[in-house]
């Protein structure tokens, strides 16, 4: 029988909504048929460290927190890892799960995708009601300032599904080449201080 053990690496309760995010990701992965062995960095005891090597795949949620650990575990134990953008929004969640499914095929992937599609249908109806009342959600400029992985995940969701943004600026270190296509501008720390003045 196929094994479907995974670890989530790079989670923390100190990030906004971190504990709830960890619970939601565990729920999504469990629904797809994965056994989440550890959530490294969030509610994990020292005794659980040995269990990290028992997974077939490590999923790095916030690369600035977990990428070094995932590389170390791969080197020491041979456990492969992936580090997709965190799943913000429905499209982001679908993309995130798709990358995991490609790396380690799930037992029940269709159930997880069906749940996202049902949530999208509910969201569509709710959003249309809001649009009828308030009009389209449009912004001339939006600035996202957050830890690197969260900033780029939020930027992707804002750009692709949450709102119509003419100019999107992200104040975070560049994550990868794909980030160039998400934001119109990347600001440095000095730029964000000037923008606050």
Residue ranges of model-derived segments:
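An N-terminal assembly and electron-transfer interface module characteristic of large anaerobic redox
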Residues: 1-197
């Amino acid at each position: 029988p196929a094994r479907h053990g995974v670890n989530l690496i790079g989670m923390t309760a100190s990030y906004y909504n971190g504990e709830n995010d960890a619970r939601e990701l565990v729920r999504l992965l469990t629904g797809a048929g994965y056994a989440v062995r550890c959530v490294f960095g969030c509610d994990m005891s020292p005794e659980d460290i040995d269990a990290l090597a028992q997974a077939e795949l490590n999923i790095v949620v916030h690369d600035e927190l977990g990428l070094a650990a995932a590389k170390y575990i791969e080197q020491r134990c041979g456990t492969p890892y992936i580090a997709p953008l965190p799943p913000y929004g429905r499209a982001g969640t679908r993309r995130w799960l798709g990358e995991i499914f490609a790396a380690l095929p799930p037992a029940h992937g269709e159930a997880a995708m069906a749940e996202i599609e049902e949530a999208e249908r509910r969201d569509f109806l709710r959003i249309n009601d809001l649009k009828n009342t308030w009009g389209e959600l449009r912004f001339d400029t939006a600035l996202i300032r957050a830890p690197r992985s969260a900033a780029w995940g939020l930027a992707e969701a804002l750009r692709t599904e949450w709102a119509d943004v003419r100019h999107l600026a992200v104040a975070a270190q560049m994550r990868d080449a794909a980030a160039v296509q998400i934001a119109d501008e990347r600001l440095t720390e000095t730029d964000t201080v000037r923008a606050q003045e």
